[in-house]
C-alpha cells in the first residue's frame, strides 16, 4: 500500500493539498456569508452571524466525531494487515452513528431554534436576522454533518482529491451564489443562507461519486458488537470533536461576556475574529487530516520511523501556519474588518487593539490542534482528551469568566493567548514522551 511503503514526503504533501480544501469546508461557507451579510446589513448583520456561529461548530464537530473517529480505526485496522475486510465494520458503524446524530441535530434546530439562538447571545434585533439566515439552511442541516463523515473516509480510502473537489464545487457556488442572492436578488441575509444550503448539497453529491468509482473499498456490512464499535469511534474521535465544539462553547461565553462588559461594537468586531480564528484552526485541521491516515496506518503496521518522518513534516507545516496568521493579524487588523462589514468609525477605532491581542493566540493554536490528531492516530486518546478539554473548556472558560472581572473588560481578549500557552506546555511534553515510545513491532489493534 502507498501509505505503508511509499515515500513519506510526496504522500504527505499529496494529502495536505487535498485535506487543506476539505478542512476549509467549515470556514468557506461561514466566512463568505459573514463578508456578504456584513457588507449588506452592516455591523448588525455581522453580529447576527456571530450568534449563529456556534451552530456550525456543533454540527461540524458531530461530523468530526464519527468521521475522524471511524476513519482512524478503519485505517489502523487496515494497516494491521488482516485483509478480511473487517475495517468496513467501522465504516458502517460510523455511518449509523452519523445518521442518528444528524437526526437529533435536525430535530433540535427545528424545535428549539429561537431559544438556542437566544442562549447563544442574540437579543431581539439580532434574533430576527439570525432566524432569517437559518430559514433555508434548516431543511439541509444534516448534510453539514454527513459531509464531514464522508470527507474523513474518502481520505482514508485513498481518494483525498475527490473530497477536495467536493469542497471546491460547493465553495465556488457559495461564493458566487452569496453575491447573486444577497445583492442582485436583494435577499440579504436569507440569500446568504440559501447559497450556503445549496453549496452543502453540491459538496455532498460530489462525494457520493466515490461509491461508484474504482478506488472505492468502502462497504456497508453488518457490524459485530455495534455498541462497542460506536463507543470506540466516540472515544477515538472525541478529542477532534471537542476541539470544534469547544470553539462553539467559547463563542457563546465570549458573546455573553462581550455583551456584558463591552457592548455591541465589540461584538461586531468579534464576528470577524471568529472567522479569522476559524481559518487558522482549519489550517491546523488540514495538517492533522493529512497526517492522520499516514500515521494511523503505519501505527497499525508498527512502522515507527515512518510515523516520525510524518510528524516532522507536520510540525514544519504547523510552524508556517502559525507565523503566517500571526503576522497577518498583527500587521493589518482593519483589513479583516473591511472585508466582513462596512465599519463605523467607532469600530475602526477599537478593532486593531482587540484583533492584535487575540492574535497572540495564533502562534500556538495550530500546534495544539494538530496534537489532538497526532495523539488519536497513535492511539493515545487520553492525551488528546486533556489537550482538547483544557484548551476548549477548562482553562479557557475560567479565563474568559475571570479576566474581565479581575483585570478589567479589555483583559477578556487575553483569555485565548494565555490558554494556548498553558496548553502548549503539556502538548510538547506529551508529544515528546509518546513519540519516544512508539512501537517497532506488532499489531496495535
Task: Identify the residue ranges that each predicted region occupies.
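N-terminal transmembrane alpha-helices
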Residues: 3-40, 54-69, 73, 99-106, ...
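Alpha-helical transmembrane segments of multipass membrane proteins
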Residues: 31-35, 107, 115, 149-153, ...
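Helix-terminus/linker motif at the lipid-water interface of multi-pass membrane proteins
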Residues: 28-47, 117-124, 180-187, 248-275, ...
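Short runs within selected transmembrane alpha-helices of multi-pass transporters and secretion channels
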Residues: 67, 137-155, 163-174, 192-207, ...
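Short alpha-helical transmembrane segments in multi-pass integral membrane proteins
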Residues: 1-19, 74-142, 184-238, 295-361, ...
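Interfacial/gating helices of multi-pass transporter permease domains
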Residues: 37-57, 125-129, 189-190, 229-236, ...
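Small-residue-rich hydrophobic transmembrane alpha-helices
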Residues: 46-107, 144-163, 269-327, 331-333, ...
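Transmembrane helical elements of multi-pass membrane transporters/channels
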Residues: 14-33, 136, 147, 170, ...
